[in-house]
Amino acid sequence: GVSEDTIRRDLRELAAERLLLRVHGGALPASPAVADFHAREQVGSAAKTRLAQAAIRLIMPNQVVFLDGGTTNAQLVRQMPRDLAVTVVTHSPSIAVELVDHPLIEVELIGGRLFKHSIVAVGAACIETISGIRADLFFMGATGVHAEAGVTTGDREEAAIKRAIAGQSAETVILATSEKLGAASPYLIMPIEEVGTIIVESGVPDDRVKPLAARGVTLIEA
């Protein structure tokens, strides 16, 4: 057998290489979604497009929709039909700019300090503005989606912003590409039970999605 000390040392080395996230009693796969924004845009773009198309079917005319930043939500706005009439609230300048040519979409851009990795605003001013808005839907980005570890991301301030928006939204929806399922990042956004719907790629192994469904989350395959 392998000694506990050897296992602990191996876990420490893997954690140092960011291949896993150590948790109480063991370890989880570390989310690979840590590259810079433009590098992440090139990863799995076909899958992100399918998830985005499924997400758009959840949006009803005249709703108020919070849109998080990130590369999957960038695909979501690119797939939005030109005749869709909604109000989009976002703390992502890049998401706002994508919607400039949509004549029926009202865009509310929330400001703050720019977190360059995700191209989103963060900070106290951002949270204060969010507290005055109520939304029907929040399409939230995350780097890890795990039944026990919850919904996680790689930055503490970004996690706080996402949590604040979810608290002001009737339903939170996550578009989760396969590499995010079963993975975890250092900062908890919320327990998985607080998410309404997760849109996943069709054909994802059952062991990745069944634990999520068991916690009451609605799963949509795309």
Which stretches of residues belong to each language-model region?
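HTH-adjacent hinge/linker in prokaryotic transcriptional regulators
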Residues: 1-66, 70-71, 77-85, 89, ...
